[in-house]
């Protein structure tokens, strides 16, 4: 993989590590909750871009019409990088968070972010390590 991929993957791993810190925080604090939502969105965006890089560079899949997150997720599912349903659900949450002006959306999804989505990011991280033969 190229240097751009390496930087993006490293950013994804760092963002995931920071997001995982949310598991140790008090969600009664609105600042913690909004920070968790923002970090989730950033981590998700880095993840789908890493997927796109892998699809192009490792699988030579270049038939994306627009290269949108939804298209990338569908292609990533086809080659077993991810489980489609969970990641499509994550995309929906990420899109909803974009328009969360009063904190209601992040409040509704914080439990899923911390309880499920972080683990899905870690699963993806392990898949990438295996495909790209990345050592810790």
Identify the residue ranges that each predicted region occupies.
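Solvent-exposed interaction patches of small proteins and small membrane subunits
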Residues: 1-136
């Amino acid at each position: 993989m190229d240097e751009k991929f390496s930087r993006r993957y490293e950013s994804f791993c760092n963002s995931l590590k920071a997001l995982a810190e949310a598991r140790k925080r008090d969600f009664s604090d609105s600042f913690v909750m909004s920070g968790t939502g923002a970090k989730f969105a950033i981590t998700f965006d880095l993840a789908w871009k890493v997927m796109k890089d892998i699809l192009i560079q490792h699988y030579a899949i270049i038939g994306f019409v627009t290269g949108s997150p939804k298209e990338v997720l569908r292609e990533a599912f086809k080659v077993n990088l991810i489980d489609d349903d969970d990641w499509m659900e994550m995309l929906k949450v990420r899109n909803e968070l974009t328009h969360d002006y009063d904190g209601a959306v992040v409040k509704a999804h914080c439990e899923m972010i911390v309880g499920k989505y972080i683990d899905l990011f870690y699963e993806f991280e392990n898949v990438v390590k295996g495909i790209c033969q990345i050592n810790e």
